[in-house]
Amino acid sequence: MHRVLFLYVRRSSMIYDLSHTIAAIATATGESGVGIIRISGTEAYNIGEKIFRSKGKTRFKDFKDRTIHFGTIVDEKGREIDEALVLIMKRPHSYTAEDVLEIQCHGGRQSVSDILKLVLRSGARLARAGEFTQRAFMNGRIDLVQAEAVMDVIQAKSSKGLSTALSQLEGRLSGIVADMRTELTDFITRLEVTVDYPEEDLEDIVVHDLEKTMRCMMKRMEQMLKDSSKGRIIRDGMTVAIAGAPNAGKSSLLNYLLAEDRAIVTDIPGTTRDALEEWVSIQGIPFRLVDTAGIRETTDTVEAIGVTKARNYIETADTVLILKDRTQPFSDEDKALIKSVPDGKGAIVLTKSDLKPLLECRDLEVYGLPVFSLSSKTGDGINLLEEYLVSRSGESGTGENEVLLSNMRHIELMRQSLNALKRAEETMYVGMPTDLILVDLREAWELLGAVTGETVQDDMVGEIFSRFCLGK
């Protein structure tokens, strides 16, 4: 149990100085309606008292928690910089669990910049990227899963991605991991008792109970890892390469799916010479659509580079849509393109269904790929293609309340923890000493702790928060 306690308190003993008061601009750079400067730390209110003059009768030091006050920001010589609202959030009831002061001023570049400079001159230092969230983690208000979910909320590319991130921010994944660690802690403790007091003859009973619990835990881990592909797509999106010969309708399809004229469409073959990437949300799933250059033999140097890039996207994309103008005969080049698509990734899309066809869907079923017919002019058939893309993401089988692994760090740690449990199971099966079972159980316990940050290394924490934006 000493080891458990030591690892639990590691988070608050990491090499990180919480004594400094930090400040940063929390809104995007540029002109806007409102600009926000966030201050956190022991000197936050002393700084506020120096620079804020309230329009009300209450003195700054008498401001109550979770209140808003209107006034002006003044510099060291009493000169007014801007009108502002200040928000008071006293520890531990704030984002960082420290005293926090937020200044809301007009969103001009100069006003926000001048106020931040004044705050820094008054005793704060400029916050590093992600440092406010890092303090929330260090002060125990959130765990590492929740901290990473903050950035996922900000970067969500779709409604499903936002929902998954909010679920993790609320602590649902953390709760599952915590329950697993609690069960492992219980059995580690009970097994240690059998080692320390062998005369009690409890080992067979404890090992039998452990086997049943481990099987249930491993089954749940395996299911979560299986479903993690859905989580990854919801978080990071699915890449869809739109490929085909020149004038097959690739750019027209991209424009229809985006509901805007993003790509240039002409009757001139080779108009698209480089890959054009855009994000679109279909039924809440983020898709990264790549309109590639038309694939053909060419002596044009620039177009040839585009064709090479198109072939690279065909190799690496999650899904490849092979577009074919159904008013044109099927060629050897079309056959070669279909064969170049990795197994299980391709679908054939016959375009220009509003025109008199030379090809029917049944003509191409011999290639063993899904075949769709559509018109980017009328929209006919595109809903079926969208349903196909959603089904490719795996989202069609996801329950509303399902907790998904979406972060690669979490997925890898869960996989390693599962492997440690499998080794423990094998050790029990062959009748090895209890001490060896404990080695694998402790490793599984520690790896799960790294998910939530209880046993994570200091350098990993720093690396995670360095990905955040300033002011968060």
Each model region followed by its residue ranges:
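C-terminal-of-GTPase-core extension/linker across diverse P-loop GTPases
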Residues: L18-I25, T29, S159-I282, T298-D300, ...
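Glycine-rich, N-terminal phosphate-binding loop of Rossmann-like dinucleotide-binding domains
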Residues: G107, L257, T292, K324-T327
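Generic enzyme active-site microenvironment
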Residues: L289, L323, V349
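Inter-motif core of Ras-like GTPase G domains
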Residues: I305-R326
